[in-house]
């Protein structure tokens, strides 16, 4: 294992939210890797004292070998906030700060300095209010690493759900599903299940778009015109695909027990099942990037900032999965 492969970068996200609290909570235990937090050191130290938790920071040095993180400490890649942070109060003045932390962490992950990037929650609305067009982390990282196509996947211990389309109005979904887009999404999904999850022959179950997967064309034509031909082409390339199946059929234990991943056609087709089954234990993963990226599955929880009641479970799960994916990639 290379030294830098033992180094993960973390972006706590929105400074007024629970992200800084969670970064400090992560620091309260030992980790087998070095955790480099891209944030304002003054923000973390102030929040740690508000939470009454011990925190020592050491400045990140790229030329030094990675060290396993000891409880009570974090390595810091510093970016300064523009205005004073009040826990629970959004300030448009710090939007550029948030984006700068993402850019710095992303560049380090692209260059291979960091083996993985783990993100805390950002407040999309306040970034956009600052005049910075921002759809989400996924799109930001894709753009910055010049990836034409990435895939959003959420995972729990028992279930992985990838999305054929992500943050689109429902009205725009059918037009966004083409044979070409399905080809790209499924190829990335299959490849990353092999390389980052260590699954030699992934079985991917695919949802139809319409109720009853179109009922043979009586309830929509997307399955017949687009989804089935795309799956047949991919099967000829050796990808193991089952479907399209009606989503309400597919999300039953008898099918899911054989699925390495489920491909849902749109955001709210696949994610409610997964969230119900594993909220707080789910991890958001971006597939198709030139680096490993995992994320918490919750928002900024402004009302919990600096209260000491924020749950670090999702962040720990996201970190542990990133470490597992690094190990799979190195094998």
UniProtKB/Swiss-Prot annotation:
Sites binding a divalent metal cation sit at: 167, 212, 267
What is this enzyme's catalytic activity, as reactions?
A: 4-(phosphooxy)-L-threonine + NAD(+) = 3-amino-2-oxopropyl phosphate + CO2 + NADH
Its GO biological process annotations read: pyridoxal phosphate biosynthetic process; pyridoxine biosynthetic process
What cofactors are annotated for this protein?
Zn(2+); Mg(2+); Co(2+)
Keyword Metal-binding in annotation:
yes
**Metabolic or biological pathway:** Cofactor biosynthesis; pyridoxine 5'-phosphate biosynthesis; pyridoxine 5'-phosphate from D-erythrose 4-phosphate: step 4/5
**Enzyme Commission numbers on file:** 1.1.1.262
Provide the alphabetized UniProt keywords: Cobalt, Cytoplasm, Magnesium, Metal-binding, NAD, NADP, Oxidoreductase, Pyridoxine biosynthesis, Zinc
Family, according to the entry, reads as follows: Belongs to the PdxA family.
Q: What does this protein do?
A: Catalyzes the NAD(P)-dependent oxidation of 4-(phosphooxy)-L-threonine (HTP) into 2-amino-3-oxo-4-(phosphooxy)butyric acid which spontaneously decarboxylates to form 3-amino-2-oxopropyl phosphate (AHAP).
Protein name according to UniProt:
4-hydroxythreonine-4-phosphate dehydrogenase
């Amino acid at each position: 294992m290379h030294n830098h492969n033992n180094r993960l970068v973390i972006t706590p996200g929105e400074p007024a939210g629970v992200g800084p609290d969670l970064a400090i909570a992560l620091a309260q235990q030992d980790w087998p890797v070095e955790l480099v937090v891209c944030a304002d050191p003054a923000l973390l130290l102030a929040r740690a004292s508000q939470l009454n938790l011990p925190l020592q920071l050491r400045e990140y040095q790229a030329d030094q070998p990675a060290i396993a993180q000891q409880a009570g400490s974090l390595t810091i890649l510093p970016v300064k906030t523009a205005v004073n942070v009040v826990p629970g109060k959004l300030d448009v003045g710090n939007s550029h700060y948030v984006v700068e932390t993402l850019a710095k962490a992303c560049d380090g992950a692209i260059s291979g300095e960091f083996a993985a990037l783990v993100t805390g929650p950002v407040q999309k609305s306040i970034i956009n209010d600052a005049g910075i067009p921002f759809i989400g982390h996924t799109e930001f990282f894709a753009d910055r690493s010049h990836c034409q196509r990435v895939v959003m996947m959420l995972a729990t211990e028992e279930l992985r759900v990838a999305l054929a389309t992500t943050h689109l109005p429902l009205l725009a979904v059918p037009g966004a599903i083409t044979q070409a887009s399905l080809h790209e999404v499924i190829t990335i999904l299959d490849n990353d299940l092999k390389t980052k999850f260590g699954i030699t022959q992934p079985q991917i179950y695919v949802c139809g778009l319409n109720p009853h997967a179109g009922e043979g064309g009586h309830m929509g034509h997307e399955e017949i015109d687009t989804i089935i031909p795309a799956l047949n082409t991919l099967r000829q390339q050796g990808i193991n695909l089952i479907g399209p199946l009606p989503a309400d059929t597919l999300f039953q234990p008898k099918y899911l027990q054989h699925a390495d991943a489920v491909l849902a056609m749109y955001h709210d087709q696949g994610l409610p099942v997964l969230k119900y089954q594993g909220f707080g234990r789910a991890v958001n993963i971006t597939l198709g990037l030139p680096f490993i990226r995992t994320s918490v599955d919750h928002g900024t929880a402004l009302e919990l900032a600096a209260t000491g009641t924020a749950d670090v479970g999702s962040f720990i799960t996201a970190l542990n999965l990133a470490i597992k994916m690094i190990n799979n990639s190195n094998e």
